[in-house]
């Protein structure tokens, strides 16, 4: 089980790759009067510098071993992040490929015209089954997964979260909801796994049915922040609120993008600080793990969205 536990990296050996932080402005294709939509901004960064060749090989929708997607249908909008478990590197396996393939399958299902976003956990189940049963199966590894959907007809948010990626919803400058982590033990999140050999019994194999599902009604101006643990392990909730409070009701994509950029920059800075008392360091202490103080270098992926309901005719 050792290679499914995230390694506590030597923080001095990693340099965050600023050049790999790619800016993206995305908004929903749905613009009909009265139809709810999410105005989205995406940003991220890899914890390790990548060459131009590596960037071309891993393609879009990846920041290191993190991956993400967004999709839109007449009835739903869907956002997802996955964090490949880096311990597989000891076996020469790039868990980022697993995360990317999982998100790719989620995107394919979520882009079907009839998809309504009411059951993101079933979306995760179907996507994992497709990945697991794909032939030839040349993808192995494991990752966390967090899916968030907007069901347009009743303006309701639905979610499915497995592991320690997560999301929070802010309204009027306060946290309305935050997802809970799922951990086997410290730094060992629940994870979906396809081992290189079916008989391999020394790896964690959690089920997508174990993903925690929630739903709550949204209001215009609500903010949804979806991210991998590279953000949450380094930026306390109070700092997140301070960064986002001024965005309440903001639906201009450029302002959301600037905020997403600031969040990633803040997480990168704190992740390499030797003196900051990070959420990760506090959790380590609570679990009697000798980590000391400081941040946790990691890949970071952030999707920031604001709910807009255009005026009805």
From Swiss-Prot:
<dbReference type="InterPro" id="IPR001932">
    <property type="entry name" value="PPM-type_phosphatase-like_dom"/>
</dbReference>
<feature type="domain" description="PPM-type phosphatase">
    <location>
        <begin position="47"/>
        <end position="307"/>
    </location>
</feature>
<feature type="binding site">
    <location>
        <position position="83"/>
    </location>
    <ligand>
        <name>Mn(2+) 2</name>
    </ligand>
</feature>
<keyword id="KW-0460">Magnesium</keyword>
<feature type="binding site">
    <location>
        <position position="229"/>
    </location>
    <ligand>
        <name>Mn(2+) 2</name>
    </ligand>
</feature>
<dbReference type="GO" id="GO:0005739">
    <property type="term" value="C:mitochondrion"/>
</dbReference>
<dbReference type="GO" id="GO:0004722">
    <property type="term" value="F:protein serine/threonine phosphatase activity"/>
</dbReference>
<dbReference type="GO" id="GO:0016311">
    <property type="term" value="P:dephosphorylation"/>
</dbReference>
<keyword id="KW-0904">Protein phosphatase</keyword>
<comment type="similarity">
    <text>Belongs to the PP2C family.</text>
</comment>
<keyword id="KW-0464">Manganese</keyword>
<dbReference type="GO" id="GO:0046872">
    <property type="term" value="F:metal ion binding"/>
</dbReference>
<dbReference type="InterPro" id="IPR036457">
    <property type="entry name" value="PPM-type-like_dom_sf"/>
</dbReference>
<dbReference type="InterPro" id="IPR039123">
    <property type="entry name" value="PPTC7"/>
</dbReference>
<keyword id="KW-0479">Metal-binding</keyword>
<dbReference type="Pfam" id="PF07228">
    <property type="entry name" value="SpoIIE"/>
</dbReference>
<feature type="binding site">
    <location>
        <position position="84"/>
    </location>
    <ligand>
        <name>Mn(2+) 1</name>
    </ligand>
</feature>
<protein>
    <recommendedName>
        <fullName>Protein phosphatase PTC7 homolog fig</fullName>
        <ecNumber>3.1.3.16</ecNumber>
    </recommendedName>
</protein>
<feature type="binding site">
    <location>
        <position position="83"/>
    </location>
    <ligand>
        <name>Mn(2+) 1</name>
    </ligand>
</feature>
<keyword id="KW-0378">Hydrolase</keyword>
